[in-house]
Amino acid sequence: MAATAQRPRRFIDRGAITAAWVGVGMAVTIGVSFLLVIPIEPIYWYLALPAGLMIGYYANARSRREGGPWGRVLLNGLAAGIATGITYALLLLAIKALFFTADNGFRDGGQSLVCQTGAECVYQRYLAAGQGEALAAAGVTDGASFTALYWREQLSTATLVFVLATAGGLGGAFLYGVTNRRRATDEVAPTA
């Protein structure tokens, strides 16, 4: 019986599936670190692309995709990048929703804002921080219009970090493909 090459039965390799879960964990770790522990949100945004690059590269290293094929290399990176990007975006929105709905107006100085818990307190907090003119220029006049603006901006940011992580996944896969091509000298000679 002649040995025949079997076609892959998956769109992505098992190693890429593992890498996708690693990407989920990485996104959660970055999110907890820079949205909760040390709340510096711009760092969270800036790390989306490098996180995607690393996970796209790792998806193919984990799958041992040295030498291609290019379609599979790119799909592995794309899948891992999408998983990382979705987690990145959903975690951002979940943490924003938590703080948006739970804001009771408490301030560091001890004096609370006079407001109803949730959107109204967040709106009053922005007004107290001197953002009234900028909000009015954006058409915000009350808690409801502030809520619409706030969530539109948060969805825009979540989309941005999703796109950055996903594009990073493709970029990482491309870098892996370029730097891990098989060469004739890499072939193993048959043994006698």
Task: Locate each region found by the language model.
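Functional transmembrane-helix hotspots
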Residues: 91-131
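Low-complexity, intrinsically disordered extramembrane tails and loops of integral membrane proteins
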Residues: 1-10, 182-192
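Cytoplasmic membrane-interface segments at the C-terminal ends of transmembrane helices
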Residues: 56-77, 170-188
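Membrane-helix interfacial "entry" motifs
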Residues: 10-14, 37-41, 65-73, 77, ...
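Hydrophobic, lipid-facing residues on alpha-helical transmembrane segments of integral membrane proteins
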Residues: 16-28, 32, 50, 54, ...
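Membrane-interfacial segments
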Residues: 36-41, 63-68, 95-103, 107, ...
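Transmembrane alpha-helical insertion/packing segments
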Residues: 1-67
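Individual transmembrane alpha-helix segments
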Residues: 135-167
